[in-house]
């Protein structure tokens, strides 16, 4: 409706249900992390909590070939973990129990929609089977693994089989130069533009983060810092796709929606860089994002129906929150 009719494939209402829930979850996490204690923020969190608790358990894939719901289950988990912490702080035991029940449904859906190859994809153009034959997609696997780590750290154990298979699938797509394949279906074309370092720039941050969280020793401090430096030094390889309405039309087949996604996970990596590197990397990230804030205060990178301003702003805020200096003791 704000995109001049240039929109991505979204069959049946469940596609938009998935978009809406994923974006609501991201905004919920952003408000929780960066919104402060203002009454309006607390009211918004109450409303989003009620929406997520009611609707996340109802979400399914849209059709046999379109599974955007995997994004909502992943970002939904991250929001639910934060809402659970909020309920624990308020000593609201019934609310904690209800949130944990919904978390269990998200584990169930991610089990149900896991690719036969391990990990997840959001399209199954192969067979459209009950157990998806979708190609395992590197950045989807990494996104889910980051959410699973948050659950694990909150004392809620994700299904081990899913974790093991997703890590294996992500490692299969990790190239010797540090890039990540877009998806396993491209394993026979590792030097195609989209799979080269510039094409992987928005994916490598989340891939590095996921493997680091799940204790892959190859993801050293140096690897993380080098790829963050590349993100800032070569930012326009990613930025040239920003706001272009056709997915993958930019250099190295980069789609616009990787811009704030990549910077969001770059923000999360700030917790994993050496103290000596953190201030300059935080400054690079903050400067990069603040220069791109729109006149009305939001951020967006790809015209996705009516969801782009919300998800872009949420990801930018979550990244900027990680750029704040910790007060000196």
Features from the language model and the residues they span:
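Preference for long, amphipathic alpha-helical scaffolds in soluble/luminal domains
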Residues: 1-329
